[in-house]
């Protein structure tokens, strides 16, 4: 009888250890693949500030609420950014739209390697960061997916001209573009070679969405003057409800819009 008790106790112990081991396999891991890309974002709305460099993580799986969060922990060792995927966090208040869980992680400029850890699986990437762009290359990937190998950064003292029109007034786009080109204090430029451009590349939601154009200035006052230039142009050339919009997006988070002018 005593011998049977010992056997039963041993079996219970083995089952408990087995359950404990299986539970540990799911601690600090998630079950969905991850898309990611570097981004430059701002902390405030339309307040002048330099953009902060982040790594944006997006789950491939979509959830019932748009504001699910991807919880991570991270550390830096010898210029290597190590990111551990912990769990998907359910929000207290649900924003009722289906969407992925997301997370933004600080991306220091000294980093030259990124490591993702999901349970017992490890993905790694090399990364090069300079003032012009961020370049990322795969070393080994299993559950993570890089959206863009090359990502341009916001050039200092730059802005984007973004405009959309109706089909019968497309000339307004060209007219304001000429205003910008004729300004001796502004220089048009292009993002050379391949890479994701941080500015909107076209307008959105118009009958005609024109390609964006990019300019740089040497004196910030010249950029500030664009507010009144756009205001005057809009009053003289854009009719209300004509389906035309013009926006100026500055690299420092300041923007001007025609619909706030006319």
What are these regions (language model features)?
Residues 85-109, 209, 215-230:
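An anionic, turn-rich surface loop/hairpin at beta-sheet edges
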